[in-house]
Amino acid sequence: MLAGLAWALPARAQPAIAPGLLDYAGTALARLIEGARQQAIADGVRPIPPGVYRALLGYFPPALLHRVRFAVGGTRRLSLPMLAFSYGDAKAITLGDVILFKNEQLADSNLKLWAHELTHVMQYQRWGIMGFAERYVRDSAGVEHEAVDTADRFAAWLPRRGSGASD
């Protein structure tokens, strides 16, 4: 999600960073995420494309797939998604239950990226926006590791699903 901006943060927070600063950074990130989510919704979001939905169904729960919305591109003003897409290597960014993709092609065809970002949606469901932001500031590598692992497992599962095999 925000790995493209991870160069600005340590992979794991160092003990020399005061806990109060980490708390402040977590609060600031949560505000940026919520603001970007609201802006994306105001700009217009869509349900998961039907072909992508069908491919994800069976690995991800239907309730999750029905809830998630997506859009393409960042906002026009200075924002977290704009920074992630312009100055980082982010292909997508997850803002609660809204996924912003850098371009339409990624949204239409990159199922592994969808699996990665849906994992972040599930993390938001477990932790809330503030909890997600706090964890991301303190251990972005750990947050991303779960999403990468899920995406890898999904990619391995996808070719087998038609044969009746399941995990």
Predicted regions mapped to residue ranges:
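N-terminal export leaders
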Residues: 1-2
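N-terminal signal peptide c-region/cleavage motif recognized by signal peptidases
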Residues: 8-10
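Acidic/histidine-rich, surface-exposed loop or edge segments in extracytoplasmic proteins
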Residues: 27-42
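Active-site metal-coordination segments of metallo-dependent hydrolases
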Residues: 42-50, 135-148
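Auxiliary, metal-adjacent structural segments of Zn-dependent hydrolase domains
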Residues: 43-93, 98, 153-161, 167
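Short pre-active-site segment immediately N-terminal to the catalytic Zn-binding motif
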Residues: 98-115, 137-139
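Catalytic Zn2+-binding segment of zinc metalloproteases
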Residues: 118-134
